[in-house]
Amino acid sequence: MAGCAMNLQFSSVVKVRNEISSFGICNRDFVFRDLAKAMKVPVLRIRGGSGRQRSRLFVVNMSQSPIEPQSGGFAATEQIKGEGDNSILGKDNVRNLGTDQLENLDIDGNVGDGFNGSDGNGGGGGGGNGGEGDGEGEDYEEKEFGPILKFEEVMKETEARGATLPSDMLEAAKNYGIRKVLLLRYLDLQSSAGLLGFAIRSWAMLRNRMLADPSFLFKIGAEIVIDSCCATVAEVQKRGKDFWAEFELYVADLLVGTVVNIALVGMLAPYVRFGQPSASPGFLGRMVFAYNALPSSVFEAERPGCRFSAQQRLATYFYKGIMYGAVGFGCGIVGQGIANLIMTAKRNINKSEENIPVPPLIKSAALWGVFLSVSSNTRYQIINGLERVVEASPFAKKFPPAAMAFTVGVRLANNIYGGMQFVDWARLSGCQ
């Protein structure tokens, strides 16, 4: 307030008054490490021009041993002290703070939001209700993903299987622990016969996506098969009697489409994040840190350690659009370049053949980039959201083939529409 001189003084010792013992203090799972029996807690006093002092103190209940898991509740009490008056402590001035809120206390003793974006479980505003929300969120995560195994438990389970952990998983186990369901899923996948087990052990990108979504490879395979069949049908219908005369264009579209299908599914697939990302100095480091915090797709489900805000989900749509555009342009250069070489060689061999104009290379590649960035990005984001809803349904959890059948059906409809739409875009742009 203007004209009011503020003097902040931090006292080093708190003298606990007898009135505190009459109030119940909520115990939380908070472990005090290497604390002495007496604890010094800072007191914040604010003195205004009116001469009134307003103090905030924090009282720690040390009635239980600090080595016990349930030891020590934490409460915030507020005193209003007038000049020369005794301290007045009212019941309404006591509020419980969870251990997660303890780290987020600001200079006024308030509880801020310590999460990047929205945690979804009591992340905002202070008070006991936020702590209860966190507890409910933790219970749900433990039910859905299993308990967090400590390093000793992780190594015991791993050695029992005769397996070894990758360096990033090993580091995460030492520092944070690993969810039981993720550990068991990895141990099962890495022991798979053939190329799958080798790929899981050697390729972190595939491993992390398979841990988050065991049906990841099924979706890629379904996408490739469906797209190849649908592209053939759509090309025949759209090109009609010119199909065989334009066969090189069909082959180019098919080859590029196969590569693009893998990119489309892979870039939007959820993946497990081990450890905590660290921000590197400089603009590039901040950009990488911000990218790592984004969800894989707009409708990606939140998982332990992954909370996404509405702004992050919106940013994901545009970021994935840029990535899709880059992939489309690159694949267009390669695919259309091969098709143009085939067409040119064919015309040199059979000069009497009715020639069809060779599509412009850069213009065709740009068409692929724009099409993937706008149309494919939007359609596949929606597909991922629909698959998430179906896979999370009780029926699909009891009967997994239902989710797989839905995946085939929705991707079939998407590919039929997308293939016909691309031919229309190509004709309208003059590329084909």
UniProtKB/Swiss-Prot annotation:
Q: Where is the composition biased (Gly residues)?
A: 111-132
Give TM segment ranges.
249-269, 322-342
Keyword Transmembrane assigned: yes
Keywords for this entry? Answer: Chloroplast, Developmental protein, Membrane, Plastid, Transit peptide, Transmembrane, Transmembrane helix
Record-level GO cellular component terms? chloroplast; chloroplast envelope; chloroplast membrane; endoplasmic reticulum; plastid
Which GO BP terms apply? Answer: chloroplast organization; leaf development; photoperiodism; response to reactive oxygen species
- Presequence boundaries: 1-47
Region (Disordered) location: 109-140
Q: When this gene is knocked out, what is seen?
A: Pale interveinal phenotype due to marked reduction in the density of mesophyll cells in interveinal regions of leaves. Increased sensitivity to ozone and a virulent strain of the bacterial pathogen Pseudomonas syringae pv. maculicola.
The main location class comes to plastid
Q: Where in the cell is it found?
A: Plastid, Chloroplast membrane
State the annotated membrane topology for this chain. Answer: Multi-pass membrane protein
Q: Does the keyword Chloroplast apply?
A: yes
Tissue specificity is: Highly expressed in the vasculature of developing leaf primordia, margins of fully expanded leaves, hydathodes of rosette of cauline leaves, basal region of the lamina, stipules, root tips, stamens and in the abscission zone of the funiculus.
In which family does this protein belong, per the annotation? Belongs to the RETICULATA family.
- What role is this protein assigned? May play a role in leaf development. Required for leaf mesophyll cell division in the early stages of leaf organogenesis. Acts in a developmental pathway that involves PPT1/CUE1 but does not include ASE2/DOV1.
State what protein this is by name.
Protein RETICULATA, chloroplastic
Q: Which organism is it from?
A: Arabidopsis thaliana (Mouse-ear cress)
